[in-house]
Amino acid sequence: MPKIGPMEILIIVLLVVVVFGVGKLPQVGDAIGKGIRNFRKASTGEDAKEEVETKEETKPAEKSE
């Protein structure tokens, strides 16, 4: 498998700047970061834990008399 060096990374960054423009870079970076974060959560199973916790928190409270 070919290794990615600093020159290849620079070329990729330049291509991203040309394609998306400087104004869109923060939005693109944010979207990529969220995607990576969601992928990591899904691969470690944190989503399932959060769903269980959310369901427990949303149970209706018992009425007091």
Curated annotation (Swiss-Prot):
Membrane-related topology note: Single-pass membrane protein
Transmembrane segments annotated in the record for this chain: 9-29
Protein name stated in the entry: Sec-independent protein translocase protein TatA
Organism annotation: Dehalococcoides mccartyi (strain ATCC BAA-2100 / JCM 16839 / KCTC 5957 / BAV1)
Major localisation: membrane
Cited InterPro entries: TatA/B/E, TatA/E
Residue ranges with Basic and acidic residues bias: 43-65
Known partners and oligomeric status: Forms a complex with TatC.
Keyword Transmembrane tagged: yes
Entries under Gene3D superfamilies matching the protein: 1.20.5.3310
Described function: Part of the twin-arginine translocation (Tat) system that transports large folded proteins containing a characteristic twin-arginine motif in their signal peptide across membranes. TatA could form the protein-conducting channel of the Tat system.
MF GO annotations: protein transmembrane transporter activity
